[in-house]
């Protein structure tokens, strides 16, 4: 049984390349001691992501591993159980029902209509960076506050509550800073907050925020239950910004490692769309897809996975599969890419369009304002999140060097 190498979180790709050379799926033991099956090639990954006998709800599978995962990932507190009634934990027909109810709130036109506001938020954050006397942490000052502000505005969260939302988000995501007690406290607080938010809307009237839209979502009289609504708000909070933080940070790091490419984006901002798509493939924000379980034996690449087993799909590995992508270790925005960074099948990320749009705006506004941005530390000194699910930096110190411009393109006043 394989173990994750010591440098896995910093650079997982050599490990993945070795695994792909040996087979499509491997048994591994995580650092928590949990045993799982890791799927590493593109075709097998897509097969698992759409396989009818691979489930999201561990209670629909049987076996020791599924029971262990269910015990470890739910039931910690009553709040945790209430936050589990969302799309990522559901299988058909429940998943189909939930997705039908919530999809209108994420309509492409509604997401694209946010672009002017996202641009304004980006420029406000860059204005603050422009006033810094020395190096700044681009994650702390830009990549994190941009999407969390967007999500909070979407959810109708008041400005004074957004710092608390950020703290809760950090606590519940798998990071070295997370503790069981901290996660329990954060989930309890999130449930209490959304309970009060829903009650306030029902008493005082609805707005144009996502919680209000979810409250009124209906399909032939079917509506979200209270706990389903709370769970969806929680999912939007966490999934709605974590991937974007990583996507922005990973992309900026990749560009700063190749200064001519960074400057080229400054000269040709329209190139941002294929650049973001290639970044999603090359070093995307999600390392491994969320947990899945076998409800019946399945065979992948000649290997049978028994019933009731935990299955992890390594999206980061699948997107560098040599049998599907030419020279996959090269960053090439000109390639025609059909990556699976946002998943595949019925669980394809509902917020993919929002994440893409935020990343495009974040990058073009950044390079416009700071065309000579550069790293403030050696790349080897950067710290990566120790999360099996997420692929992202803990910090990104940069010098906002050069002659910045303001939002109109004129030289900015210092």
What residue ranges belong to the model's regions?
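Cytochrome P450
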Residues: 1-414
